[in-house]
């Protein structure tokens, strides 16, 4: 086992209890109504959407906390680049992907009972490709992936360039996804 950690990849996840998830689900469904238009830009929910004001505030606050933990530069701040909704669009988000041109991504789940998002390590496959891994317990040094099982009301923030995939779900799932940038002030 290694005795020192030199690099790390973090995510933030927590439960939010005071949002009107029913209204947020209706908003997601409204912006995902065309079954032939599954591209992100066609599902844009609008950063100025009045139903997203409180969620936008939480996303900005949590994103700024992450940025502040990475740098002591007082001249940078986060901003919301775009927001879109997903409503059981399993076929479009089941390929591993990253969110290019962004600092962070955030996903809020106004409804999720069997949702799964899987993150892939940017490091471990390089070393594990030389070792047949049989492990009694998986940990950060011998795992090439990490699965999160979000429930209704969960918010997850992660580096936008972290490779991830949303695994298919059998039950109804709604999510609101943000890309977050950084700018000089």
For each predicted feature, which ranges?
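Karyopherin-beta/Importin-beta family HEAT-repeat alpha-solenoid scaffold
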Residues: 2-4, 156, 165-166
């Amino acid at each position: 086992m290694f005795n020192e950690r030199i690099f790390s990849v973090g995510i933030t996840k927590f439960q939010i209890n005071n949002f009107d998830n029913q209204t947020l689900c209706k908003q997601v469904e409204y912006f995902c109504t065309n079954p032939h238009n599954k591209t992100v830009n066609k599902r844009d929910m609008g950063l100025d959407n009045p139903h997203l004001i409180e969620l936008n505030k939480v996303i900005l606050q949590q994103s700024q906390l992450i940025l502040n933990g990475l740098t002591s530069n007082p001249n940078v701040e986060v901003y919301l680049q775009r927001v879109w909704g997903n409503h059981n669009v399993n076929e479009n988000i089941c390929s591993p992907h990253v969110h290019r041109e962004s600092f962070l991504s955030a996903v809020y789940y106004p409804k999720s009972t069997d949702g799964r998002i899987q993150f892939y390590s940017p490091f471990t496959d390089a070393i594990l490709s030389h070792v047949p891994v049989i492990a009694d317990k998986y940990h950060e040094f011998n795992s090439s992936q990490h699965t999160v099982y979000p429930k209704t009301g969960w918010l997850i923030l992660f580096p936008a360039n972290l490779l991830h995939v949303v695994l298919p779900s059998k039950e109804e799932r709604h999510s609101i996804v943000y890309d977050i940038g950084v700018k000089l002030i």
